[in-house]
Each structure stands twice: as C-alpha cells, then as structure tokens.
C-alpha cells in the first residue's frame, strides 16, 4: 500500500495542501508549530477516524472554517483506491471510492504510527502495551475488533453483577461462560501475534543498532496456565479454574480480577526488563524497533505493507542511530512519512524532503 497523492483542507493550520509523495521516504522538516505533525495527524485521521493528539474533533477544524477534509489516492493490492473524510456541522463522513463506508472497510488506509507518546510503551502502564497489541490486531482483523468490543461489553456486565452481589444468579453463570470464551479467543490472538512480533524484532534490532544487544518481548498473562503448548482449549480450562478460585476475592472487591484487560507485554533488553533499566535513548530505540516490527508483522499476516508515520522520531537519537534509521527507511519497501525540526547533520539519501512553514509545503531550503 502506497499513497499516490493526498489533499488536506482546513485541518488545523493547514488551509490547503496537495502533495504527491515519494513511494519511499518522505521528510517534512521545519520549526515547531509550523504544521509538520498536522500533516501526519491528518493522514492518521483519514485512516482511523481519530486524532492521535486530541479527543476534541472540533479543534481539528481550521480557524474561521466550518469543516475539514482529507483525501488520499493510494494503490492497494494492484487497485487504485480513493478515500476521504469530511467533518463539520453535518458530522463526520468517511468515503471509499466516493461511497459512504465504515472504518472496518477492507480497502481503508492502513497506518502504523510512531509518536513521542509511544515512549510510554516501555515505562508506562500496562494498558499502553495492551493498546499497542490491540491496535495492530485491529488493523489486521476486523473480527478481532468485534470480539474485543464484545469482551468489553461482557466485562462491564460481569462487573455490574459483582457489584450487585448477584454471582449466584443464572445471568452471572451465562455471562461467565461468554466472558471466558471471549477472553480465551482474545488471548490466543495476542499470543500468536507476540510470537510473530518477537521474530521480527530479533531481525530488526541489529539492523538499527550495532551495539550487539538483544531485544525480545514476552506476553504476561494475568493468571497461571498449565505448562506445555498453549492452545485455545488449554486457555479456556486454565481460565475456568482460575475464575472459580478467584470468585470469593472478586465478590469482596466487586470487580473482575483476571482476563486480557489486565495482561501485559514484557520487553527485555539484554535479558533485563527494559522498563526498569533502559535509558531514555534506549527506550526511544526500543519503541522504534517495536514499530518496525509492527510493519513487518502486518506484512507477514496481511500480505501488504501499511503506511509508516514517524513524528519527531530523530529527537534524542544520536547521529549514528539517526543516520542508520534514515538509511533503513530510505531502502525499505514500505512508504514512510517523517517529521523533524532539523536535517543538516543527517546523511539523508533517497528521500523526498519538504520544508513546512506556516502550514504550507515548500521545497527544501
């Protein structure tokens, strides 16, 4: 998947931008608050229907405008797709090839994003890492998103019955069965994904780093599982045993104490827990490798590459790692869009480079 051209209109400080990107690495540079990140945000908004910076959609519309529009034409599995999103007084409308569509459409734009907030993947709370896994699985499978949504609804009902102390009711028994079934299905999807991600990370880390180190990830369940090869039936049995043993604790605390909503992903750098020992620079480097592993995992499962957005990824990286990353991106088969404040000290090659100033795209200065 590669974007052939896109147009952004009345999105934050971007009054009107039209751009035909390179199929490889595209770099937007310039001073802060000029609109670099807004370009990436607009593409992300087109792909997901959400902003990665704000929950208030009204703030996305340019000052003195009543609506915004983002359009893109891209190739997808040997076909040309046109997609657009408009948002204004009449609400939000997403279209694929000029027809109204939903965000689970198979031809939607697929995006992997690196933003400064992703540094919390290493040292942040477990929900950040769960979101990392769920977002990738959602990009890969609409079925996973459907199951995740159902799980959250069932979890809410289960917690409500625990609060009402109705654990002996028939309703609780039925909800318990559904809860365990959905939980096991989500877990097997996450575990399978972790295996593919870990393989990708093992391959990517030495290409970005020359420190001889090793990066790996492991899935941390919120309940014990019988030893041996894990499959769906084993997960269901283990979950059932644990639910039965935890019932009294759950009654006292009036909430569900196990399940995929409480799991974690552990990250190890040179056999040590990264969240405890990794420096700020190492954390950024780890997240970059995780994001590249996302792309390779997506490609392995879906058969095509998503678009890679990198916001201020070069900040806090030394010159050697920055140049190595830029070279890797320039030579990669996927399309990437990167923002940076300055480029003078970097050996940028095979990239389309534009200065962003006052919400406008200018040629390289």
UniProtKB/Swiss-Prot annotation:
The keyword Zinc does not apply. The keyword DNA repair applies. It is found in: Cytoplasm. One of its GO terms (molecular function) is single-stranded DNA binding. Signal peptide: none annotated. GO terms for biological process: DNA replication; DNA synthesis involved in DNA repair; double-strand break repair; SOS response. Keywords: ATP-binding, Cytoplasm, DNA damage, DNA repair, DNA replication, DNA-binding, Nucleotide-binding, SOS response. ATP binds at residues 30-37. SUPFAM superfamilies: P-loop containing nucleoside triphosphate hydrolases (SSF52540). InterPro entries: DNA-binding_RecF (IPR001238), DNA-binding_RecF_CS (IPR018078), P-loop_NTPase (IPR027417), RecF/RecN/SMC_N (IPR003395), RecF_2 (IPR042174). GO terms for cellular component: cytoplasm. Pfam families: SMC_N. HAMAP family: RecF. The RecF protein is involved in DNA metabolism; it is required for DNA replication and normal SOS inducibility. RecF binds preferentially to single-stranded, linear DNA. It also seems to bind ATP. Belongs to the RecF family. This is DNA replication and repair protein RecF.
């Amino acid at each position: 998947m590669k974007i052939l051209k896109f147009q952004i209109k009345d999105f934050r400080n971007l009054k009107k931008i039209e751009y035909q990107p390179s199929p490889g690495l595209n770099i937007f540079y310039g001073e802060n608050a000029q609109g670099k990140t807004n370009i990436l945000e607009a593409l992300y908004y087109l792909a997901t229907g959400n902003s990665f910076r704000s929950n208030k959609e009204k703030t996305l519309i340019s000052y003195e405008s009543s609506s915004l529009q983002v359009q893109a034409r891209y190739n997808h599995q040997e076909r040309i797709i046109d997609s657009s999103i408009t948002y204004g007084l009449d609400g939000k409308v997403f279209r694929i090839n000029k027809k109204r569509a939903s965000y689970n459409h198979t031809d939607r734009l697929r995006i992997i994003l690196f933003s400064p907030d992703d540094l919390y993947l290493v040292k942040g709370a477990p929900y950040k890492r769960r979101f990392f896994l769920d977002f990738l699985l959602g990009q890969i499978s609409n079925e996973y998103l459907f199951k995740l949504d159902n799980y959250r609804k069932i979890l809410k009902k289960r917690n409500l019955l625990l609060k009402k102390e109705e654990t002996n009711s028939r309703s609780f028994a039925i909800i318990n069965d559904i809860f365990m079934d959905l939980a096991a299905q989500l877990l097997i999807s996450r575990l399978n994904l972790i295996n593919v991600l870990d393989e990708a990370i093992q391959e990517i880390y030495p290409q970005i780093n020359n420190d001889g180190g090793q990066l790996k990830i492991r899935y941390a369940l919120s309940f014990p599982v019988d030893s041996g090869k894990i499959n769906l039936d084993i997960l269901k049995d283990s979950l059932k045993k644990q639910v039965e043993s935890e019932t009294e604790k759950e009654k006292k605390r009036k909430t569900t104490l196990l399940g995929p909503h409480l799991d974690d992903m552990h990250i190890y750098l040179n056999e040590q827990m990264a969240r405890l020992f990794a420096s700020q620079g190492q954390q950024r480097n780890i997240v970059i490798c995780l994001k590249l592993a996302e792309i390779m995992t997506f490609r392995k499962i879906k058969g095509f590459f998503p678009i890679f957005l990198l916001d201020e990824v070069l900040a806090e990286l030394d010159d050697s790692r920055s140049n190595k990353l830029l070279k890797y991106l320039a030579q990669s088969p996927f399309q990437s869009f990167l923002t940076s404040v300055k480029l003078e000290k970097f050996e940028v090659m095979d990239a389309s480079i534009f200065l962003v100033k006052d919400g406008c795209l200018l040629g390289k200065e």
